[in-house]
Amino acid sequence: MHLTNVAVQKRGADYNQHHGGKWNLRHCRLHVEATRGRAAAARLFADMDRLIVDSLRAVQAQIINDRHCFECYGYDILIDDDLKPWLVEVNASPSLSATTRADRVMKLALIRDVLDVVLDEGTAARDRPMRGAGGFEVLHDEAGERSAAAAAKPRKRGR
């Protein structure tokens, strides 16, 4: 729902003071399921997952990989009438200031979920219980890919 700056949206006749033009992913998915069906919603969310993974893979060499820090990215995605997602921009360290009560609730949940994920040391992402990952899900597990590929390789036998 969020496409332009909130300061600009607030002046529009269609501005909703309750949610400020922002929905969480659950509400977005429920809306798409109600208006287009579950299969269409599943395709849309799979396409958005792929878009996010592809964008991160495209810049992975530039992303700092340090176990002592993390980054939260904000994705602005436009969904057209055919339910095709278009990447508008990716924000490094997006604003966490809230413009409405609903926005505050959503952002506090985001912060809690991010901390649940990054503070769970010593457990591989694929082995973490989902309750410890908040509303997040693993979209791509590169470490799991490497270990699966290594396990599938034929091993040389020593003589």
Which sequence ranges carry the predicted segments?
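Catalytic core of tubulin tyrosine ligase-like
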Residues: 1-72, 82-85, 104, 109-146
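Intrinsically disordered, low-complexity intracellular terminal segments
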Residues: 147, 153-159
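Glycine-rich phosphate/pyrophosphate-binding beta-alpha loops
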Residues: 91-99
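A short beta-strand motif that forms the metal-chelation/ATP-contact edge
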Residues: 77-79, 84-92
